From Swiss-Prot:
The disulfide bond which can form in the large chain dimeric partners within the hexadecamer appears to be associated with oxidative stress and protein turnover. Belongs to the RuBisCO large chain family. Type I subfamily. The gene is rbcL. Transmembrane segments: none annotated. InterPro entries: RuBisCO, RuBisCo_large_chain_AS, RuBisCO_lsu_C, RuBisCO_lsu_C_sf, RuBisCO_lsu_fd_N, RuBisCO_lsu_N_sf, RuBisCO_lsuI. This is Ribulose bisphosphate carboxylase large chain. Mg(2+) binds at residues 192, 194-195. It is found in: Plastid, Chloroplast. The record marks 325 as: Transition state stabilizer. Its cofactor is Mg(2+). The modification N6-carboxylysine is found at residue 192.
């Protein structure tokens, strides 16, 4: 008799297990599956589970040397998608032992590394992940988190204000520093390097760091508030990235920045560890996210990338605006904003949250609203995002007819007016425009901004 039965086999025999009870230590994934015509849902769901865990396309004799039952991914539930005949959600459970501790890189390589090019599927999208407590605890997470950041900055009870310095490419370091100073002097908490500002011929990183640090200290001395500028440490190698972070620390600045998707999760986690060890805050930009998350039926939802960032580490992350120039549906956005900030988030399908997620006291991340927003959006932003957020007005500060500092003043006045109105019990949704108008009566800077950007 032969030791094992050779040949190609159906995945669903081994990998579709509807009776399976998920364990607390399993990593759970929700995939939106669009199979090729004629492939039944069970087979497609099982194929996803197999290809992203222990499966290969044929029987191999080395299967006999291990326990498949202990190590295989299992498709344990399939549900139809309302309004889509050819789509369904496949739920897959992965045993914890398949993953290296503290490695977002390995988690993604395992779960989404190979299976997305699979022939039996027309399209595949990872909608959500449930990270078990045991796995969360192997990550350091954000270098500092929301509470520690507020304590370092001594700013409480309101969202923080930021601004990306434009034009993003072409300024010299000295002029760039001047723009930073004007914004901070006017009343912003932070200014930001654009995500594509690294170290180009017209402005090398070291010069920029120096002039921005000078701008920061000057603005701090003038205003009596702590100021920050997100110095982009993203670089072509990890060594160079850490070198830039070290220089930022030597200058004594409070915060650096990283593009976590283009830079990669390994680099990002290294930088996050450095930042915690050296008291630097870490601002994360999500350049390249739309390549991965924009298609509705293929790729990965941003909430998965956001969860991954909280594990890998970052104190701020860009997460859409709900109101500006970039797309983002309100409930769905609020769903992953809460996943970033809160310690425990209940499953809620109306907000796109497929699993209850317990972060077991991992620090939270501040969501950053950025992109096409201006003073008229302030009431809505204050209401939607609440206190724990960073509101970033690039053109909405620098586009002010009187210059950067008055633009910053306008934003700060608008924010303080909205926070005060909210604290007095007024309804920002219905009275927002009126609140801004009232505030603009005693702030010429805000009045000028209201003129430029009509409601």
């Amino acid at each position: 008799s032969v030791g094992f039965k050779a040949g190609v086999k159906d995945y669903k025999l081994t990998y579709y297990t509807p009776d399976y009870e998920t364990k607390d230590t399993d990593i759970l994934a929700a995939f939106r599956v669009t199979p090729q015509p004629g492939v039944p849902p069970e087979e497609a769901g099982a194929a996803v589970a197999a290809e992203s865990s222990t499966g290969t396309w044929t029987t191999v004799w080395t299967d006999g040397l291990t326990s498949l039952d202990r190590y295989k991914g299992r498709c344990y539930h399939i549900e139809p998608v309302a309004g889509e005949e050819s789509q369904f959600i496949a739920y897959v459970a992965y045993p914890l032992d398949l993953f290296e501790e503290g490695s977002v890189t390995n988690m993604f390589t395992s779960i989404v590394g190979n299976v997305f090019g699979f022939k039996a599927l027309r399209a595949l999208r990872l909608e959500d992940l449930r990270i078990p407590n045991a796995y969360v605890k192997t990550f350091q997470g954000p270098p500092h988190g929301i509470q520690v950041e507020r304590d370092k900055l001594n700013k409480y009870g309101r969202p923080l204000l930021g601004c990306t310095i434009k034009p993003k490419l072409g300024l010299s370091a000295k002029n760039y520093g001047r723009a930073v100073y004007e914004c901070l002097r006017g009343g912003l908490d932070f200014t930001k390097d654009d995500e594509n500002v690294n170290s180009q011929p017209f402005m090398r990183w070291r010069d920029r760091f120096l002039f921005c640090a000078e701008a920061l200290y000057k603005a701090q001395a003038e205003t009596g508030e702590i100021k920050g500028h997100y110095l982009n440490a993203t670089a072509g190698t990890c060594e160079e990235m850490i070198k830039r972070a070290v220089f930022a620390r030597e200058l004594g600045v409070p915060i650096v920045m990283h593009d976590y998707l283009t830079g990669g999760f390994t680099a990002n986690t290294s930088l996050a560890h450095y930042c915690r060890d050296n008291g630097l805050l870490l601002h994360i930009h999500r350049a390249m996210h739309a390549v991965i998350d924009r298609q509705k039926n293929h790729g990965m939802h941003f909430r998965v990338l956001a969860k991954a960032l909280r594990l890998s580490g970052g104190d701020h992350i860009h997460s859409g605006t709900v109101v500006g120039k970039l797309e983002g549906e309100r409930e769905i956005t609020l769903g992953f904003v809460d996943l970033l900030r809160d310690d425990f988030v209940e499953k809620d399908r109306s907000r796109g949250i497929y699993f209850t997620q317990d972060w077991v006291s991992l620090p939270g991340v501040l969501p950053v609203a950025s992109g096409g927003i201006h003073v008229w959006h302030m009431p809505a932003l204050t209401e939607i995002f609440g206190d724990d957020s960073v509101l970033q007005f690039g053109g909405g500060t620098l586009g002010h007819p009187w210059g950067n500092a008055p633009g910053a003043v306008a934003n700060r006045v608008a924010l303080e007016a909205c926070v005060q109105a909210r604290n007095e019990g007024r309804d920002l949704a219905s009275e927002g425009n009126q609140i801004i108008r009232e505030a603009s009566k005693w702030s010429p800077e805000l009045a000028a901004a209201c003129e430029v950007w009509k409601e």
